């Protein structure tokens, strides 16, 4: 289906686009949209007055980009590849103009590669109480208590948990069926903390530079390095397991 250009959505100002996106993406800003334009991911036309005018297709691309970053933690170069895989000037042939295209494999990627499920991390910023976490994960309170004591799961501001805690709990429960106890999972937490410190060292200087769009560039750099780190970690584990099994 070709990109729609209805009177209601054609030629929107950047402020109108911001209002359209914010219900689903509360953290989006005008500077973020301008940054994505500077990166060539969206190309609004310019009115005779010089102001940006966004079409429905531009808005759909923005929604795709923001969702891919938030829900899959993808760096911009991977998102760009996903968008380039779509027919030029077209939106998905199903649903409304704001239904996003499904992510397609990036050329050269194999299972477990960058941009695949192994490198996907949700960043929706959900805050869960202890009761909410237990309900969502369907895990016994005793396991959560043990994971907290072992430092595998931590709480954020106000004592709330994020959405990653749900996945951690479910994985811990599954591993428990193989005799893996919470204390055994400390090594995973320690490795994750060391890797996040390394990513912060790489991306942090961009934020401190204080240039326009610096925070967005640092955020994308962190996503890219994190995706590579996740893929590397997964491959190292697979390689080590193979070596152990074939000794």
Curated annotation (Swiss-Prot):
GO terms for molecular function: DNA binding; DNA-binding transcription factor activity. One of its GO terms (cellular component) is cytosol. Gene3D superfamilies: 1.10.1660.10. The keyword Transcription regulation applies. GO terms for biological process: regulation of DNA-templated transcription. Residues 14-38 bind DNA. Pfam families: MerR_1 (PF13411). Induction: Autoregulated. Residues 11-85 form the HTH merR-type domain. Keywords: DNA-binding, Transcription, Transcription regulation. InterPro entries: DNA-bd_dom_put_sf, MerR-type_HTH_dom, MerR_fam. The keyword Thylakoid does not apply. Contains an N-terminal DNA-binding domain, a linker region and a C-terminal effector binding domain. Dimerization is mediated via the C-terminal domain. Homodimer. Transcriptional regulator that binds to its own promoter and thus may play a role in the regulation of the cotranscribed genes Rv1827 and Rv1828. Can also bind several promoter regions of genes that are essential, including ftsZ. Binds to the imperfect everted repeat sequence CTCAA through its winged-HTH motif. PANTHER family: HTH MERR-TYPE DOMAIN-CONTAINING PROTEIN, REDOX-CYCLING DRUG-SENSING TRANSCRIPTIONAL ACTIVATOR SOXR. Was identified as a high-confidence drug target. This is Uncharacterized HTH-type transcriptional regulator Rv1828.
């Amino acid at each position: 289906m070709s990109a729609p250009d209805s009177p209601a959505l054609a030629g929107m100002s950047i402020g109108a686009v911001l209002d359209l996106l914010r219900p689903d993406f509360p953290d989006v800003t005008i500077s973020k949209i301008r940054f994505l334009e500077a990166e060539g991911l969206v190309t609004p036309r310019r009115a005779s007055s010089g102001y940006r005018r966004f079409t429905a297709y531009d808005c759909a691309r923005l929604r795709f980009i923001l969702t891919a970053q938030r829900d899959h933690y993808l760096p911009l170069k991977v998102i760009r590849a996903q968008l380039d895989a779509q027919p030029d000037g077209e939106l998905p042939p199903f649903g409304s103009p704001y239904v996003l295209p499904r992510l397609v494999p990036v050329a050269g990627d194999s299972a477990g590669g960058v941009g695949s499920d192994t490198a996907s991390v949700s960043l929706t910023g959900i805050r869960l109480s202890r009761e909410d976490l237990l309900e969502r994960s369907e895990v016994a309170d005793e396991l959560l208590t043990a994971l907290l004591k072992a430092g595998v799961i931590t709480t954020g501001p106000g004592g709330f948990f994020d959405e990653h805690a749900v996945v951690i709990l479910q994985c811990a429960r599954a591993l428990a069926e193989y005799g893996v106890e919470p204390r055994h999972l400390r090594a995973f937490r320690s490795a994750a903390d060391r890797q996040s410190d390394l990513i912060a060292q790489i991306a942090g200087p961009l934020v401190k530079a204080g240039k326009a769009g610096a925070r967005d560039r640092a955020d994308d750099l962190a996503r890219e390095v994190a995706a590579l780190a996740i893929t590397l970690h997964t491959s190292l584990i697979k390689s080590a397991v193979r070596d152990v099994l074939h000794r």
